[in-house]
């Protein structure tokens, strides 16, 4: 049984982790921490967990928690996790970090988007935790940087095609939409009900911090610098994410070749579903699950490829993928604890 701690258990992602680990047959939730709610019971903070989770939130004492767990999820803000991960690693605790602190190989790219990195020596040790693409590297790691939600939705459909040389690496555009839970649980004017209900708007055009994360991965896969035009939008939904990605195919690329590349990559994967030709993802069909659905259309005349993906931003885009990473780290079947299915409505 894997003993698990969740640091930052009272945010939306942390709460999803609490739910998933509580229902995981090979893991036991041993500790939950919260700076804001220290000393309060999880079931008091989230009444839906009443009678299910009886843990009390505690301060994040690394040495005390390390004695009780095998794995820790750091569901902490960006710039905070890097202060805790090194000591957990030193204490032989495997770390899955859900912030951006260990998603980058290039410290300069991280620092340009966030701040100075205080644990640069760990960046080469950390593995980017996009499970279906990097599971072999994840399996041998002690530190996983769980990908961002937008990068997950963009990279899963795009990387297999870049690897096969089927798309041009210049002029890639992603038009992405996210539910409001992506903004986190802390109250803010931008996520206030009256500000988002019955509305739809773009935000952070030209300066979203997920762009350098996506560009680093694509550049490494393409073995050349790649820039992505990324336009995020805020949907008046609680959860869910849909990305529409535009790219030009290389000379000679056909629809059949696109499908073959996607199926070769994902046909044996539980959580990535390549839809039949002519069908496209719907947020409703992945909400509450760890699935990523992918559809595509190629205009043979213009060579314009349109990829569409849908995920639940809190699950495949965060907590679900984090648990999938834990499963890989400990040699479990990837779907363990993630047997989640959408409702009919």
Curated annotation (Swiss-Prot):
Cross-referenced InterPro entries: AGPR_AS, AGPR_type-1, NAD(P)-bd_dom_sf, NAGSA_dehydrogenase, Semialdehyde_DH_NAD-bd
- Which residues carry out catalysis? 149
Coarsely, its chief localization is: cytoplasm
Q: Could you tell me the superkingdom of the organism this chain comes from?
A: Bacteria
Q: Name one Pfam family in it.
A: Semialdhyde_dhC_1
What Gene Ontology terms describe where this protein resides (cellular component)? cytoplasm
Q: What is this protein called?
A: N-acetyl-gamma-glutamyl-phosphate reductase
Identify the species of origin. Answer: Desulforapulum autotrophicum (strain ATCC 43914 / DSM 3382 / VKM B-1955 / HRM2)
The primary gene name is: argC
